Amino acid sequence: MGSLVSSVVFDFGGVIITPITNQISDLAGDLGCSVEVLREVLMGPSHESGSHPWHRLERGEIDQHDLQDALAPYAAALAVPWRGDEVARVLAPGQFTVHDEMIECIRSLRDRGYRTGLLSNSIREFRPTLEHYAPPSLFDVYVDSSEVGRRKPEPEIFSVLLDCLDETDPSRVVFLDDFVANVNGARSVGLRAIHVGDPNSALRELEILLARSPDAT
């Protein structure tokens, strides 16, 4: 039997709430480009963390109001019309739905004795919204990329997470994320990780994994 699971950690976008790709899809239709191209313009490559403006935003290196102009060269390079309101439209409030089953799972895990965590690639200006829909009181640890200056899939952010959990054995931590690159990043440093496509399927996978070892209590 593997190590006893002590902690379960959740991403925010695409796990606790519906993914930002939904907003990108709506905007792509208006701009007359594919979702894939617009996502590349807005968010850069998902398999790495580099100098793309969105990556810098999520590391807290630039402010949200700088993003629109910073992305203009990326849009021009891919012949995407850039009208000046794209970032505001994608990040406008009220465009997502909370997965209530994830919130209930987090509460249940704490009742069963597991430690819970949030690990999110987020934006400094988004913090009030993040805390509203994922209250810190639900979690033992709360890791926001824009606060710690690291973002998934950088190995260093998983080290920050483990330090916050005071956990020396990464295999005792399960992480749920909707981006394959982030799942692979977590696994590369020894965490157990579940890719979230359908939330209910991911929760079933989590319960199967937890059933292989006794409850943390």
Report the location of each language-model feature.
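Phosphate-binding loop of NTP-binding sites
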Residues: 118
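Proline- and acidic/polar-enriched loop/turn elements at helix boundaries
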Residues: 40, 69, 87, 121, ...
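N-terminal helical cap/lid subdomain that shapes the substrate entry/recognition surface
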Residues: 2-103, 111
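Short beta->alpha connector loops
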Residues: 96-98, 122-125
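Short glycine/serine/threonine/alanine-rich loop segments
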Residues: 33, 114, 191
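Conserved, well-ordered alpha-helix/loop/beta-strand core segments that scaffold catalytic motifs
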Residues: 109, 114-115
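Asp-based, Mg2+/Mn2+-dependent phosphohydrolase catalytic module
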Residues: 1-10, 110, 123-217
